[in-house]
Amino acid sequence: MVMTHFSRLRQLLLLQPKFLSSQPRPLRSPPPTFLRSVMGSSSSFSSSSSKLLFRQLFENESSTFTYLLADVSHPDKPALLIDPVDKTVDRDLKLIDELGLKLIYAMNTHVHADHVTGTGLLKTKLPGVKSVISKASGSKADLFLEPGDKVSIGDIYLEVRATPGHTAGCVTYVTGEGADQPQPRMAFTGDAVLIRGCGRTDFQEGSSDQLYESVHSQIFTLPKDTLIYPAHDYKGFEVSTVGEEMQHNPRLTKDKETFKTIMSNLNLSYPKMIDVAVPANMVCGLQDVPSQAN
């Protein structure tokens, strides 16, 4: 009798729904699921009926996130990469090949100072790939973006929002609004907003005043359930929301003058890669082959 009762209890427990988070997000039906790789190198956000394929990839040395997005409902499965790193290009291309995707764009949120972008290397390995960055960055690329521009892969598009402050040319890429676009929306914020933080403003024409205005006018005005995916994380986080950062970000929740004081007193060390990364990234990550990055 005890065994029968135990077996029945076990059966009931197995039938209970499992939740990945104690804070459910308002999601359209059918609800997307967030899966974390056992190796911690990639994540996916999709649903059984969604046309979006999404992967969050991580480069350990610079703590950089690279994002892969594709429209898998399109016959060609067009894809783009946001903030690729030179050291992980082969990993990214292997994944793209395994998933049967066609890489169209290699995009940067800004000219990075802590790693060399993978866009130039991607172009040499896949000559049809177009490098993309903001016009305000002043760097080389195939396509230059301005605020309000849209980058499309199949029926999915990213809206370009200017978010300078960490550097003069920073942009945030935001997935489109409307029932035909992935919901909730996703914001790829570069270094403008980090999870419970933000990028430094003491080099590359940075401005704490400008960063504060950018975040509050271009990111914090998005729906509160918009998912925030930053370019870096140093504390083991993967994703946040606009609502979370508006409530809990220890810097950006302050008034502007307090924020500027915080930023001016960070006393951060000189970035160890800046003298290599910035010159390389100004020519699409290929100092020795500038003709590949025009």
From Swiss-Prot:
<dbReference type="GO" id="GO:0006749">
    <property type="term" value="P:glutathione metabolic process"/>
</dbReference>
<comment type="function">
    <text>Sulfur dioxygenase that plays an essential role in hydrogen sulfide catabolism in the mitochondrial matrix. Hydrogen sulfide (H(2)S) gives rise to cysteine persulfide residues. ETHE1 consumes molecular oxygen to catalyze the oxidation of the persulfide, once it has been transferred to a thiophilic acceptor, such as glutathione (R-SSH). Plays an important role in metabolic homeostasis in mitochondria by metabolizing hydrogen sulfide and preventing the accumulation of supraphysiological H(2)S levels that have toxic effects, due to the inhibition of cytochrome c oxidase.</text>
</comment>
<feature type="binding site">
    <location>
        <position position="166"/>
    </location>
    <ligand>
        <name>Fe cation</name>
    </ligand>
</feature>
<keyword id="KW-0408">Iron</keyword>
<dbReference type="InterPro" id="IPR044528">
    <property type="entry name" value="POD-like_MBL-fold"/>
</dbReference>
<keyword id="KW-0223">Dioxygenase</keyword>
<feature type="modified residue" description="N-acetylglycine">
    <location>
        <position position="40"/>
    </location>
</feature>
<dbReference type="GO" id="GO:0009960">
    <property type="term" value="P:endosperm development"/>
</dbReference>
<dbReference type="InterPro" id="IPR001279">
    <property type="entry name" value="Metallo-B-lactamas"/>
</dbReference>
<dbReference type="GO" id="GO:0009793">
    <property type="term" value="P:embryo development ending in seed dormancy"/>
</dbReference>
<protein>
    <recommendedName>
        <fullName>Persulfide dioxygenase ETHE1 homolog, mitochondrial</fullName>
        <ecNumber>1.13.11.18</ecNumber>
    </recommendedName>
</protein>
<comment type="similarity">
    <text>Belongs to the metallo-beta-lactamase superfamily. Glyoxalase II family.</text>
</comment>
<dbReference type="InterPro" id="IPR051682">
    <property type="entry name" value="Mito_Persulfide_Diox"/>
</dbReference>
<dbReference type="GO" id="GO:0005634">
    <property type="term" value="C:nucleus"/>
</dbReference>
<keyword id="KW-0496">Mitochondrion</keyword>
<dbReference type="InterPro" id="IPR036866">
    <property type="entry name" value="RibonucZ/Hydroxyglut_hydro"/>
</dbReference>
<keyword id="KW-0809">Transit peptide</keyword>
<comment type="subunit">
    <text>Homodimer.</text>
</comment>
<feature type="binding site">
    <location>
        <position position="191"/>
    </location>
    <ligand>
        <name>Fe cation</name>
    </ligand>
</feature>
<dbReference type="GO" id="GO:0048316">
    <property type="term" value="P:seed development"/>
</dbReference>
<feature type="binding site">
    <location>
        <position position="110"/>
    </location>
    <ligand>
        <name>Fe cation</name>
    </ligand>
</feature>
<dbReference type="GO" id="GO:0046872">
    <property type="term" value="F:metal ion binding"/>
</dbReference>
<keyword id="KW-0479">Metal-binding</keyword>
<feature type="transit peptide" description="Mitochondrion">
    <location>
        <begin position="1"/>
        <end position="39"/>
    </location>
</feature>
<dbReference type="Pfam" id="PF00753">
    <property type="entry name" value="Lactamase_B"/>
</dbReference>
<dbReference type="GO" id="GO:0005739">
    <property type="term" value="C:mitochondrion"/>
</dbReference>
<dbReference type="GO" id="GO:0016788">
    <property type="term" value="F:hydrolase activity, acting on ester bonds"/>
</dbReference>
<keyword id="KW-0007">Acetylation</keyword>
<keyword id="KW-0560">Oxidoreductase</keyword>
<dbReference type="GO" id="GO:0050313">
    <property type="term" value="F:sulfur dioxygenase activity"/>
</dbReference>
